[in-house]
């Protein structure tokens, strides 16, 4: 049974307004009073984008399989027999494209015009769909009799030229047929061009108990309003914008109004005392608990966590490394790991059925072994009754200062050797990710606040990492939970030969060279991000 509730106009008429309109239209069929909702929502719908405003590349995962198949058949003109064998499939589970029956077509277009004697056009298209640059290897035996792959630069260069011409042919073809054009525009607009930004105004907030000598600036009050009324937030504020006081005021005001029960501030280890003094400078009567190094020594940890759990504190301040020492319960960790393992096992079965790349299956087998080892380690650990878990300390909002220290979050990608992608797991990042998922569940996506002066410093991959921490559900709703889906929608990689760091020859390095569909990416990111630069 749907339980109606009142919302302010600025909240209701922002966010995913296309989805809200479709719900309002549905409800207004049964109940006339929802007609007014639909009328207001109609006025704030984003303007539909046209083909000229949408960038599409070969490999973009929101394009239906049937159109990729259509393109393949039009480009390579396989005979009727070959067509009956060839099928293009995309797996939501693994994020992998697969062309079945690649070897059925021996025509000149597949082997010569768009392919080479070493690689067929179908394999080149499959690699392109999976965002991989084509590479041709020769297999030789070293002095110990081991088989070694050696990159054939000449054949690779020829194959990559064919790959470039196929990609260009796809871009020339995709928007040509009117029916296909209309369908693709509709899919893109519904999925990505559906957000109306919400403006937050904190001018009405009274800040009871604040130091009367201190006046918060407008951008600070507005950011407090965002944290209180919006959901998970990222304060991307430059040094000097006062993000410490913004977070403190948001925590105190949220607690006063019953919007959260207990706030935990996770700050760089050497700044805990400075944070405490700034906290008390803004709210002199606040009741806060600050962790010292001693509190997290083995013999004192349980007692300190017990104080967090039972004390009626306005806020608790701990260091980054101390936060990691308050674990999620073993049961919850096992559940999360088991879910990931089930997904990977299904992915491997699917990949083998579809005859996917050996490389993909090997990567997934490696991930599977890693997850099994983690589960075994959890099972082998003695059940320590004296450990207080994160779920038990009663925290329902976490403020993470200098959140860029957590940007090294593992991601799986089919792309090879791409700059800026963490292929190793930083324990503190996976621990934080697990806790943000728990808080999302507990608070409906309102319990995580990040602050950093550098949300994106080296690579756009960091933007995706921030989105995973703060708006994972939004990524899932848009089919972007795989990094490769996100990358194929908003970015393009370029591969080039460069000198290997140890000077022992050349290697192929892939980098994100350009980004497109940026207005839609930024609109999505700004649902959580509050950015303040020096000139604002």
Across the structure, where does each feature detected by a protein language model lie?
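Conserved helix-turn-beta segment of the N-terminal RecA-like "Helicase ATP-binding" lobe
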Residues: 270-297, 303, 307-310, 470-474
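Short coil/turn segments at secondary-structure boundaries
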Residues: 184-187, 198-206, 238, 500-502, ...
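Charged, low-complexity intrinsically disordered regions
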Residues: 1-194, 284, 308, 312-316, ...
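Walker B catalytic acidic pair
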Residues: 401-402
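Glycine-rich, phosphate-binding/catalytic loops in enzymes
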Residues: 241, 252-253, 280-283, 332-336, ...
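Conserved pre-motif I regulatory segment
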Residues: 194-236
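Inter-lobe coupling linker of SF2 helicases/translocases
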Residues: 301-348, 353, 358-362, 366-397, ...
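Conserved SF1/SF2 helicase motif Ia
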Residues: 238-241, 246-277, 283-287, 442-447
């Amino acid at each position: 049974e749907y339980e109606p509730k009142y919302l302010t106009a600025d909240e209701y008429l922002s966010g995913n307004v296309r989805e809200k309109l479709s719900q309002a239209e549905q409800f207004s069929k049964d109940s006339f009073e929802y007609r007014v909702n639909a009328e207001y929502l109609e006025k704030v719908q984003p303007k539909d984008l046209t083909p000229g405003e949408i960038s599409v590349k070969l490999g973009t995962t929101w394009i239906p399989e049937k159109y990729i198949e259509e393109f393949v058949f039009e480009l390579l003109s396989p005979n009727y027999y070959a067509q009956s064998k060839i099928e293009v499939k995309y797996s939501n589970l693994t994020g992998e494209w697969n062309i079945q029956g690649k070897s059925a077509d021996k025509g000149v277009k597949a082997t010569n015009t768009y392919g080479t004697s070493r690689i067929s056009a179908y394999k080149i298209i499959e690699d392109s769909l999976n965002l991989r640059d084509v590479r041709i290897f020769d297999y030789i035996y070293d002095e110990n009799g081991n088989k070694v792959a050696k990159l054939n630069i000449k054949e690779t260069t020829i194959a990559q030229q064919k790959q470039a011409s196929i990609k260009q042919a796809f871009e020339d073809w995709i928007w040509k047929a009117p029916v296909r054009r209309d369908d693709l525009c509709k899919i893109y607009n519904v999925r990505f061009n559906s957000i109306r930004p919400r403006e937050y105004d904190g001018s009405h907030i009274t800040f009871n108990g604040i130091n009367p000598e201190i006046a918060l600036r407008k951008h600070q009050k507005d950011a407090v309003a965002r944290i209180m009324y919006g959901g998970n937030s990222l304060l991307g504020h430059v040094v000097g914008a006062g993000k410490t006081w913004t977070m403190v005021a948001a925590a105190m005001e949220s607690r006063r109004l019953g919007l959260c029960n207990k706030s935990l501030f996770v700050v760089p280890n050497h700044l805990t005392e400075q944070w405490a003094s700034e906290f008390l400078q803004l709210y002199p009567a606040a009741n806060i608990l600050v962790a010292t190094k001693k509190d997290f020594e083995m013999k004192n940890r349980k007692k300190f966590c017990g104080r967090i759990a039972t004390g009626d504190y306005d806020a608790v301040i701990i260091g980054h490394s101390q936060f990691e020492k308050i674990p999620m319960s073993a049961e919850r960790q096992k559940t999360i790991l088991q879910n990931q393992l089930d997904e990977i096992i299904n992915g491997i079965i699917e990949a083998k059925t579809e005859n996917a790349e050996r490389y993909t299956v090997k990567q997934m087998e490696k991930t599977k072994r890693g997850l099994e080892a983690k589960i075994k380690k959890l099972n082998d650990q003695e059940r320590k009754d004296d450990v207080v878990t994160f779920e038990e300390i009663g925290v329902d909002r976490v403020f993470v200062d200098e959140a860029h220290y957590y940007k090294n979050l593992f991601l799986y990608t089919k792309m090879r050797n791409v700059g800026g992608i963490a292929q190793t797991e930083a324990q503190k990042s996976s621990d934080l990710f697990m806790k943000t998922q728990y808080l999302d569940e507990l608070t409906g996506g309102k319990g995580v606040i990040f602050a950093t002066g550098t949300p994106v410093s080296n690579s756009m991959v960091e933007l995706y990492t921030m989105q995973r921490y703060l708006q994972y559900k939004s990524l899932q709703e848009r089919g972007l939970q795989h990094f490769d889906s996100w990358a194929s929608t908003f970015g393009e990689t370029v591969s080039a030969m460069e000198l290997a760091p140890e000077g022992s020859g050349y290697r192929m390095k892939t980098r994100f060279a350009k980004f497109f569909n940026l207005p839609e990416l930024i609109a999505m990111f700004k649902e959580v991000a509050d950015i303040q630069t020096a000139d604002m």
